[in-house]
Amino acid sequence: MAEELFTPHNIIVTGGCGFIGSNFVHYVYNNHPDVHVTVLDALTYAGNLENIRGILGDRVEFVHGNICDAELLDKIVPGHDAIVHYAAESHNDNSIANPEPFLKTNVEGTFRLLEAARKYDCLLYT
């Protein structure tokens, strides 16, 4: 007997205002009308709210925040089926002069998401 595929209906997309994240959000919006998306983005140099502004509404909501903020994750993760994790410090040349934001976001932030996913029984795609 074939297994049923898990279909999430309420997802969080971290980094959803960046290039890759916003394209994923648009894909979900255009191809999965039964899915609600919560975009979590810190809107640093790589994120732009304009990338998703046209689809904000009933099915797509925006939360301005940082993935390192455990209290914020405790507020928004419950009730979601899955987290799709695109948030990252990605301009690696900047890490030479200032590696701390890269460690904070890419390592600690991912850890915080893993902990929240475990705590609230939520799948994490990273």
Annotated model-derived regions:
Residues 1-125:
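N-terminal Rossmann-like NAD(P)+-binding domain of SDR-like oxidoreductases, especially those catalyzing
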